[in-house]
Amino acid sequence: MGLVSDGRSNVKEFDVFIRVVLVTIGIVTAIVLFIFLLLFLYRILRRYALKNLEYKRYFTDKGAFEGQEIQLIEELTNHGFFPLLRVYVETHITTKLYMPGASGGNEINQEFISRFFVMPYTRIKRHHRVILKKRGHYRLESAKISFMGIEAYLDSEAEIRVYPKELHIDDIQRINQCIQVSALSNRPIIRDVFSFAKVREYTYGDSINIINHKSTARMGRLMVNDADFVLGRKILLCLNFQAGNTGIPEEKFAEIQEKSMQFAAYLAGEAIRKGWQIGLIANCKTDSGAKSVKVYMGTGYGKYIEILEALSMARTIYGNSIGRIIDEAADGNLRSTEVIIFSTYVDESIEKRVEMLMREGNEAAVIDLKEVTAYEA
């Protein structure tokens, strides 16, 4: 009996041992399979995770004035089934668009890194402060996305136009005084439709309400009332980016031209608010490669924005002669218009154009930028 009992005990112990071994093998196998599954999922994530990511960014405004603060919005969307941990978005942006949260960079560019944890089928939106330090046209094109050791560049365009800085009250008083001492200021704001100086033939852009029906019937062609200068205002702003023989240092000259664009933006805003027609020409190069700026005469808020956008694209580099752009603007069609020329000098060429403009029925005056900006040699 003792031998039988010992044999059964040994069998039970062996069975227990086998079961422990099988369980251990099962656990180890499960762990190994789990590790292989994780590695498999890791490879899938590495391969497809970024394909399921959508990233875009944009500024809260299409345009704003230098010195103002706007926001840059980032949106990261996970269109996949798996959560994405530690997604990094790296952006390099000019210091002229200052971002207080930037972590690194240099005097020219700043580095900005956003960190995201994105759950499946989730969109995260973040707002970042941007202080507009310098007039210009700026575009962000791509962003660097990093996840699990994979890096990719995603197209994500964002564009902002920084308009000339708004004038300080002292500058407003100074430019208004310069305009008032010229002969251009003695004209009322409101047009009297019942008073006119003469009758002339219709030209493109004339309003229908100034048609003279009696003269039209008598002459057999469309005739309109030609308003006297005292009845309304059409203003053409002309910015001269030539330095001439003034001897002004290049850096200081660029500052003066920046101020001239601020004057132009201010006067354009005043003209639009009062219902006047306003246009702009400048002999500077632009970011688009053009050698001059030309904004046709018009009214309304859209025209104001067009002028501001043109100024944001302007570079303080001479691209054409002042005489040429005035000739192109006049071209025999400029009538009853006040032409205000901003320049650091007056030479024979400018005097000749002023005489030509006045001979063709316009008023013209030159605003001395050295005087209006209080420049001291």
Question: What kind of feature is each model-predicted range?
Answer:
Residues 1-57, 62-65, 342:
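Extracellular/lumenal glycan-associated context and N-glycosylation machinery
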Residues 1-11, 76-78, 154, 287, ...:
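Intrinsic structural disorder
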Residues 9, 18, 173-174, 179, ...:
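Low-complexity, compositionally biased segments
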Residues 11, 25, 94-97, 160-165, ...:
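Short, structured coil/loop segments at alpha-helix boundaries
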Residues 22-26, 86, 188, 225, ...:
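Intrinsic-disorder/low-complexity, polar/charged segments
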Residues 24-25, 133, 198, 203-204, ...:
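General structural signal for secondary-structure boundaries
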Residues 39-288:
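An amphipathic, basic-hydrophobic helix/alpha-beta surface used to engage anionic
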Residues 269-377:
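Acidic, glycine-rich A-domain
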